[in-house]
Swiss-Prot record:
General function of this protein: GTP hydrolase that promotes the GTP-dependent binding of aminoacyl-tRNA to the A-site of ribosomes during protein biosynthesis.
Gene Ontology MF annotations: GTP binding; GTPase activity; guanosine tetraphosphate binding; translation elongation factor activity
The species this protein was found in: Cereibacter sphaeroides (strain ATCC 17025 / ATH 2.4.3) (Rhodobacter sphaeroides)
Keywords: Cytoplasm, Elongation factor, GTP-binding, Hydrolase, Magnesium, Metal-binding, Nucleotide-binding, Protein biosynthesis
PROSITE patterns referenced in this protein's UniProt entry, alphabetically: G_TR_1 (PS00301), G_TR_2 (PS51722)
Pfam families on file: GTP_EFTU (PF00009), GTP_EFTU_D2 (PF03144), GTP_EFTU_D3 (PF03143)
Residues at which GTP binds: 19-26, 76-80, 131-134
Protein name: Elongation factor Tu
Length: 391
């Protein structure tokens, strides 16, 4: 039989399982692949290979599956620390998450922590799978746990009352026993994910943005800025804005070049050189961005959610204290900034994850959800995400 061709006719959504250790995230992931994808056994998922994202080693398992209407890429992490790192670095972006809660235990500390992290790093939607319902005989107890989950979600600004909660047993689904709480619950879960988690806007449909990686001048033609287009489309003749580091200014794109060929336009994912009108060689630099005018603003103060590397991961060997001044690496450049720790936090140990405020010495084109690395002399010591812009 000929190999099946990958059809790109369904919209693509990135998703993942989150929740407390041993509540059944990996079993649920395996069960979903049994009914909607190419079956992957528990140990194939649990033995996730290590990956490096922004200099940090993370173990994540990736599976894919399809519903009637969509194609899903699903990420599952073996350990709690992997989740923290994954969510903060955005190594595996999530358009939505399936929160797995053991019905017998109810929400536990990591349940809370994953919901908080989801809020901080901008996971917009969650659907709940209440697992191991066969271990609870009392229907009133199940109702109490459901209420508790909804209240917890609401306390972190998720719409707790509206979020779908599916009850079932991932193990029964895996073993093909007790269809009602097994297979049926998995089908109900994917139906809920299909319906409740919206398809994200594709990168090309978002406003244009390209981080500037390099700048050079072509005699007689002007200045060219090169980089990989992060989102949107740029057409020859369009007005663009140069944002970050220095006061913003406007220019016009007079040419788009890729692989030494001239194009009418460049789009998300393309590595291009953009020819800019009226900009001299010193008028634009690495670390700035070219974007649709007015779509992104420069900022210096923000609240961050960050993970600090352990010594074993190549991070610091010692804690840091208030007024710590590392470099913050945004997109293509380092900017020095001062860390202001939250009240009651005296020091931060390697391996911690926490939120703190940062003030940069120069403005950077910034939006919520933007990822960055924390560096000391070119060595990565942490990773973070902008959770809120202050100024």
């Amino acid at each position: 039989m000929a190999k099946a061709k990958f059809e790109r006719n369904k919209p693509h959504v990135n998703i993942g399982t989150i929740g407390h250790v041993d509540h059944g995230k990996t079993t649920l992931t395996a069960a979903i692949t049994k009914y909607f994808g190419e079956f992957r056994a528990y140990d194939q998922i649990d033995g996730a290979p290590e990956e490096r994202a922004r200099g940090i080693t993370i173990s994540t398992a990736h599976v894919e599956y399809e519903s009637e209407s969509r194609h899903y890429a699903h990420v599952d992490c073996p350990g709690h620390a992997d989740y923290v790192k994954n969510m903060i670095t955005g190594a595996a972006q999530m358009d939505g998450a399936i929160l797995v809660v053991n019905a017998a235990d109810g929400p536990m500390p990591q349940t809370r922590e994953h919901i908080l992290l989801g809020r901080q790093v901008g996971i917009p939607y969650m659907v709940v799978y209440m697992n191991k319902v066969d271990q609870v005989d009392d229907p009133e107890l199940l109702e109490l746990v459901e209420m508790e989950i909804r209240e917890l979600l609401s306390s972190y600004d998720y719409p707790g009352d509206d979020i779908p909660i599916i009850k079932g047993s991932a193990l029964a689904a895996m073993n093909g026993t007790d269809k009602e709480i097994g297979e049926d619950s998995i089908r109900a879960l994917i139906a809920a994910v299909d319906e409740y988690i919206p398809t994200p806007a594709r990168a090309v449909d978002q406003p244009f943005l390209m981080p500037v990686e390099d700048v050079f001048s072509i005699s007689g033609r002007g200045t060219v800025a090169t980089g990989r287009i992060e989102r949107g489309v740029v057409k020859v003749g369009e007005e663009l804005e140069i944002v970050g580091i220095r006061p913003s200014k406007k220019t016009v794109c007079t040419g788009v070049e890729m692989f030494r060929k001239l194009l009418d336009q460049g789009e998300a994912g393309d590595n291009v050189g953009l020819l800019l009108r009226g900009v001299d060689r010193d008028g634009i630099e690495r670390g700035q961005v070219l974007c649709k005018p007015g779509s992104v603003k420069p900022h210096t103060k923000f609240e961050a959610e960050a993970y600090i590397l352990t010594k074993e991961e190549g991070g610091r060997h010692t804690p840091f204290f208030a007024n710590y001044r590392p470099q913050f690496y945004f997109r293509t450049t380092d900017v020095t900034g001062t860390v202001e720790l939250p009240e009651g936090t005296e020091m931060v140990m390697p391996g911690d994850n926490l939120k703190f405020n940062v003030e940069l010495i120069a403005p950077i084109a910034m939006e919520e959800k933007l990822r960055f690395a924390i560096r000391e002399g070119g060595r990565t010591v942490g990773a973070g995400v902008v959770s809120k812009i202050i100024a």
